[in-house]
C-alpha cells in the first residue's frame, strides 16, 4: 500500500525539518520510490510508492499532466475501459493516470462516479491562472 502526504497551511510557514520528519514516517508504506515536493509557499505533497501497476519510472508520483498534479494510493480496476471510452492514450503505465484525464474532461464529481476500484487521492490543479484547486477524494467504501 502506497503512502500519500499533503500539507496545506494558509496561516504561516512550514518548518522544513518537521515536515521532512512527518513525510519520512510514511516511508515503510512504499519502499520502491519516495518523492516530496514543495508545490507552493503553502502546499506540500509527497508520495511513497509500493509499485504494483505501472512498474516504470514514468509512473512515479506525484504525476503531472497539463498543470494537474495527482498523488494516489489505490487501484483503478476499469482504467483500460475508461481510456478507451474517452479516446486518450496513456502517457504512463499507471492505472491511476486515468484520474487526471477524467478530471480534465468531466470534473471531480463525475470522475468519482466513473471509477471502479479502491483509492484515495489528491488532485492539485493549477490550470487556471486565477486560482489553484485542491481535491481530496476516496472510494465510496473508504478502503484506502
Predicted regions, residues:
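N-terminus-centric sequence/structural signature that marks the extreme N-terminus
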Residues: 1-144
